[in-house]
Amino acid sequence: DQALLDVVVIGGDTMEDILRGYRDLTGYPSMPPLWSFGVWMSRMTYFSANEVDEICDRMRAEHYPCDVIHLDTGWFRTDWLCEWKFNEERFPDPKGFIGRLKKNGYRVSLWQLPYVAENAEQIDEARANDYIAPLTKQQATDGSNFSALDYAGTIDFTYPKATEWYKG
């Protein structure tokens, strides 16, 4: 017989003592990369690779510090529908685009959602392989403005194959 639940109580005189005990048990976090503490540039969205290139070139020309350029939903094929694919009309060469930014000293952050929409290209594959946990309409609308997108489910990151699929 195996126990269904292990209960661990960590005591200490101060909160730091308790946290140290917790970290001793679970492990200490690694330090994020230095660039992640730097300056991030973003706005509601950029709508093309040309627009991003112009802004990034100007920041370098005018000696503004910037480590990360963040692209909001404008990189999507359909605004607000996260399918993890670039709109190739506005971003015709995604690899080249990101390569240019990296060469110019930028890291690139892309806005994403861990949901799959009913009309997303990936929905059939996600359902067939149990990569998503079903999402009720109530769950999709509670405190969110994404209900109009008709999300079918959230990616089940507790399932290793779903995590690998998402990374791919």
Please state what every model-predicted region is.
Residues D1-P33, R43-M44, C56-A61:
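Catalytic and substrate-binding clefts that recognize carbohydrates or anionic sugar/phosphate headgroups
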Residues Y28-G168:
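Aromatic-lined carbohydrate-binding/catalytic grooves of carbohydrate-active enzymes
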